[in-house]
């Protein structure tokens, strides 16, 4: 009897462990949260690498690494030096670095993209590296073609594919050393009926050459279509099951604007797609920006692919046939006790090294307010991070003593130059105060002040939910919630553009340099989703 009971217990434990194992073999979308649009992916052996767009933010084009397609680690940026990433003058949320493509060939990584609107930019470029973490080469400028170029190495040739802004796709063969064309660009295909054909990728799979591209604009009608030919130069026939990827006919789905995909094949022969998408709050407004999603790809008997379930990206899928590899979590708090900033920190356009320092006051990030503020397409004294979760807290301890009323420093929730919420320390009528200032559509619509002690450190905190930001201060003998603000008013549907919200630290003299620096002792960033 005892033996039978033990045997039954072991069976039950085994079944429980099997169920746990099965439960663990799923993943949830999105796989990279916060503003990470236009993902492009490649596999090198057992490793996967992925790059996304950054627009006016610097450093440009983050490079992520994964072992299992689900868990990703930021390892570097393809454009990490101001001289190879000219962003000054580019428009907020619509200029800068567009839609890169990442490929690997014969020991070298290639990233091709477009710098749109930056002073000194020459349009389309590519950079190379032996190690995807860097260093990356200086740009090889290709020319002022349209945005969203792609490359693919097939049968020893480097094919270059790009939209032409007239609804067609141009294909040529490029010298990888010089960026010159050894086979001239020619029109090989057109879009398949949707607006704004863009983001094409070129593949040879089996006997066919495929052009997979996005259509429908960047909004809720975004979708992915595919066409193929036996020759790279055409003629191309469209898939009978287009679009191969879109959530546009599922208005109640939590994911929308799905598209701009890239394909990758695993060692086991299975195919997967990474793509961009948004998560609108209550189905209406999204402020995190376009994020990166993952879905399986199936091929029918005629050689046509379909992404997800009937072309729809779902919240949960079975895990890829790969061992799970979870990276060590990044610390919630940055104490600024290292010699360099972490890879997650981001600037607006090309920063001046003179406005920030980790060495002038060791153990602190020192920001020096310049004459530049958030209203121009210049580079203000700002260092921030993507808002990577709906629910989070961002807080910092800062010591800042303004001398005149134009001087300020604090935290900011930034959608773009004309739409941001500032939680700041400044001076009013000879008194140091904390203030929340809401700027929407380039107009200050609301301010609230609270007096502070004349000296001493202040803790500034922002708490985010799906619909609201709450702004709080703490100092000696002072603790107050200064107010709240709506996430809707900084959403893409309201302010436009292609980016998402960033939260960070800043300082400004609003027309002249600050007398005193702002010393940030630490910054906490706690994602709670």
From Swiss-Prot:
Catalytic activity, as annotated: Hydrolysis of terminal non-reducing alpha-L-arabinofuranoside residues in alpha-L-arabinosides
Pfam families registered for this protein in UniProt: GH43_C2, Glyco_hydro_43
Enzyme's top EC category: hydrolase
EC number(s) from the headed UniProt entry: 3.2.1.55
SUPFAM superfamilies linked to this entry: Arabinanase/levansucrase/invertase, Concanavalin A-like lectins/glucanases
pH dependence text: Optimum pH is 6.0-7.0.
Pathway: Glucan metabolism; xyloglucan degradation
Site, Important for catalytic activity, responsible for pKa modulation of the active site Glu and correct orientation of both the proton donor and substrate: residue positions: 148
Molecular functions per Gene Ontology: alpha-L-arabinofuranosidase activity
Any one Gene Ontology cellular component term annotated for this protein: periplasmic space
Record localization: Periplasm
Domain of life, per lineage: Bacteria
Keyword check for Signal: yes
Alphabetical UniProt keywords: Carbohydrate metabolism, Glycosidase, Hydrolase, Periplasm, Polysaccharide degradation, Signal
A single BP term in Gene Ontology: symbiotic process benefiting host
Leader sequence residues: 1-23
Function: Alpha-L-arabinofuranosidase involved in xyloglucan degradation by mediating the cleavage of terminal non-reducing alpha-L-arabinofuranoside residues in xyloglucan branches, converting the 'S' units to 'X' units.
Record's miscellaneous remark: Gut bacteria supply the human body with energy from dietary polysaccharides through glycosidases that are absent in the human genome. Xyloglucans are a ubiquitous family of highly branched plant cell wall polysaccharides present in the vegetables we consume. Enzymes involved in xyloglucan degradation mediate the conversion of otherwise indigestible plant polysaccharides to short-chain fatty acids.
Name of this chain's protein: Non-reducing end alpha-L-arabinofuranosidase BoGH43B
